[in-house]
């Protein structure tokens, strides 16, 4: 069953945005914009997230709420960040990713296979045999009244990205060609299979 939508009917604003970790009012503007877009995702839409790391309680809760509304949520993270190190000789896990993964799996019980949500860890650059998956982007098929939303920038989905780092994000809305290109990139990363070319590039018209 799909819960009634409580998504905010506000479209993510296009354009650049940067945080200042030294300023109380602006240090969380990037993370807040991402989480607000998650909350604005409409039932039946898709969210694709590629983040080198994910450690933000607000994001976990927002993504689980989105799934309950009938949104398909897919989150890809670098394999090396599934662990937070070792304590007293024991490996400690990334509790944020674990909570999200388990929550999404539970929410999939009554969902058709093609609409199931999930998380995945990829090795190296996801598309290659070396490097790390350091790209960060957030895709929404529809958030509020905005369709084909692409958010790309330097910010991981972590508290540290807001409180200890300067980060930026650029949002493009309504560009179906760019959105499809980024979904294709995400799908290649999700497959975690080395690709012939080390990177992807594209040219897009009508950017907003």
Which residues does each predicted region cover?
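HKD-type phospholipase D/PLD-like phosphodiesterase module
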Residues: 1-43, 53-208
